[in-house]
Amino acid sequence: MIQAESRLRVADNTGARELLCIRVLGGSRKRYAGVGDIIVATVKEAIPDGMVKKGEVVKAVVVRTKKETRRPDGSYIKFDENAAVLIDKANNPRGTRIFGPVARELREKNFMKIISLAPEVL
């Protein structure tokens, strides 16, 4: 459950380390983002010589949340941290590697490139 001002770790190799959510995309009244939702964020922490710089405004897709997500079969999935992957205008990941597990819900939202790069899909 990500909202404005939430901080997320970055799960790719773009050079960003931490993001601050500015806006949840998907309608004027959409308040929270879950797994597979797109957010607009700013880079709060970045490594030197990375693809993105500190202060840059980026789009990202949420891949892990601490708040549990209910699945159609009645089970729940939750992670130890909130994490996102930076994406471009065509919803493809900007990085070439994904770190850590990602949720299966990304497959239903058609983020196939992220699914294929991820080391584990839960």
From Swiss-Prot:
Pfam families: Ribosomal_L14. Keywords: Ribonucleoprotein, Ribosomal protein, RNA-binding, rRNA-binding. One of its GO terms (cellular component) is cytosolic large ribosomal subunit. One of its GO terms (molecular function) is large ribosomal subunit rRNA binding. Gene3D superfamilies: Ribosomal protein L14 (2.40.150.20). GO terms for biological process: translation. The keyword Ubl conjugation does not apply. InterPro entries: Ribosomal_uL14, Ribosomal_uL14_bac-type, Ribosomal_uL14_CS, Ribosomal_uL14_sf. Signal peptide: none annotated. Binds to 23S rRNA. Forms part of two intersubunit bridges in the 70S ribosome. Belongs to the universal ribosomal protein uL14 family. HAMAP family: Ribosomal_uL14. Part of the 50S ribosomal subunit. Forms a cluster with proteins L3 and L19. In the 70S ribosome, L14 and L19 interact and together make contacts with the 16S rRNA in bridges B5 and B8. This is Large ribosomal subunit protein uL14. It comes from Halothermothrix orenii (strain H 168 / OCM 544 / DSM 9562).
